[in-house]
Structure formats: C-alpha cells, structure tokens
C-alpha cells in the first residue's frame, strides 16, 4: 500500500509537496469540510465525478452549483473564490514577468481571462521592444459568434503606450478554437496595419474550451 494513502491532504502536502496531491485531494484541501453524509474527501470526489473535471466544476454557474446536495452558498463562494484567485494569479504573473519568455505564460493568462466568457471578446497585449508587458486590454466585445475588430483602434492604442509589438487573442464561446476564415482575414488586416507603423504582431491566439489555436505555431504569422 502507498504510504501516502492514509494521509489527509494537508499532511500529505506538507510532507510530500503540493504536487503530490490528486485533484480530489487538492479540492478537499480548499473545501476543508464535507457534509453531514460525506467526509471532505468523499464529497470532493463526488463533485468531480458529477462535473467531470476541475475546470468544469470551477466554471459552473451559481444555479448549477447550489443545485448539488450539500453545496450551499458558503461552498459556492469558496469555489468561485478559487476560480477568481487563479484568474488573478495569471493576470499578475503576466504583468510582473520581466519579459514574455514563455509562450505558456501568455496562453495560460489568456485562457484564464477568456475561456468562461459567453460572448466573443477581443484582447490585445501590448509589449515593448524587449517583450515586456506594457498593458493588456479588452478592446472589442461582440456576440456569441462574432466580434467586430477595428485594426486602426489597435494601432492607436499601441501608439499611446509606445508598444513595439502586440499579441492578439479572442475566444470562441462555442468551445472549438478552430479559427474561421473571418478570423484569418481580420488577422491579416491587423498585421498589415501594424506593419505600416512598424509594430510587430507576434501571435493571435483563439481560445476555446480547454483548447487553443496559435496562429504563430501554425505559421500563419
């Protein structure tokens, strides 16, 4: 028998490190207590089985969560707090990085910002000539399946902060991150407009449910 099996999540974490915890144990660590019928580990396991994953659980809305037996407003607040803490962590990490040396940092930040949006949002990260983040903005918002993007507005914002480069991103609320022909055409327009002002477009990421597509990785930029 694995000697870690009889340890509670907190003790296991302190002895073996946070990475040793399973998803069930990590969730139980935050929930702290279970219900009248289930201990915290059994309850955490039941929640993950019901929703299918940590992502689905933390993305669920209030009605979906409080419909679960034993999950009242207190636990709802805990779960939403965990999700918001993660989102703010990635946001602060992006801003405080000396430079964007890791594409995964950018991707994780954008996923934390856009995955749960119910309509299309177009974001831009503005960078200096050393790839340090100057600012990030949600410049355009649209409908469930479309967002109108104005390349000149992107350039105008870039000039305001003296940006040397930008990273584009938008989400697909439908779940599939596969870029449409319209996505490719607007990206080409933004690239041309930025190039005229000597601003580099490093990438355009399309964010779906648990997946993404990078224009740079596909060789489209």
UniProtKB/Swiss-Prot annotation:
Zn(2+) binds at residues 170, 172, 183. It comes from the Bacteria. GO terms for biological process: proteolysis. InterPro entries: MPN, RadC_JAB, RuvA_2-like, UPF0758, UPF0758_CS, UPF0758_N, UPF0758_YicR. Pfam families: RadC, UPF0758_N. The keyword Transmembrane helix does not apply. Coiled coil: none annotated. One of its GO terms (molecular function) is metallopeptidase activity. Keywords: Hydrolase, Metal-binding, Metalloprotease, Protease, Zinc. A motif (JAMM motif) lies at residues 170-183. Residues 99-221 form the MPN domain. Belongs to the UPF0758 family. YicR subfamily. This is UPF0758 protein KPK_0116.
């Amino acid at each position: 028998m694995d000697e870690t099996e009889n340890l509670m999540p907190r003790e296991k974490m302190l002895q073996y490190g946070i990475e040793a915890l399973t998803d069930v144990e990590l969730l139980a660590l935050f929930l702290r207590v279970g219900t009248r019928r289930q201990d915290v580990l059994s309850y955490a396991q039941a929640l993950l089985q019901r929703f299918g994953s940590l992502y689905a659980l933390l993305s669920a809305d209030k009605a979906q969560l409080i419909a679960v037996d034993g999950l009242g407003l207190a636990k709802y607040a805990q779960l939403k707090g965990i999700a918001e803490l993660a989102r703010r962590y990635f946001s602060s990490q992006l801003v405080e990085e000396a430079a964007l040396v890791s594409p995964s940092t950018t991707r994780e930040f954008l996923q934390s910002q856009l995955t749960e949006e119910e309509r299309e949002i177009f974001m831009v990260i503005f960078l200096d000539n050393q790839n340090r983040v100057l600012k990030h903005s949600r410049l355009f918002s649209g409908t469930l399946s479309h967002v109108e993007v104005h390349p000149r507005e992107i350039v105008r914002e870039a000039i305001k902060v003296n940006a040397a480069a930008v990273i584009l991103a938008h989400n697909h609320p439908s779940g599939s991150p596969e870029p449409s022909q319209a996505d490719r055409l607007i990206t080409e327009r933004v690239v041309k407009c930025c190039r005229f002002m000597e601003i580099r477009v490093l990438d355009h990421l399309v964010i779906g449910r648990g997946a993404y597509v990078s224009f740079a990785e596909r060789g489209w930029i």
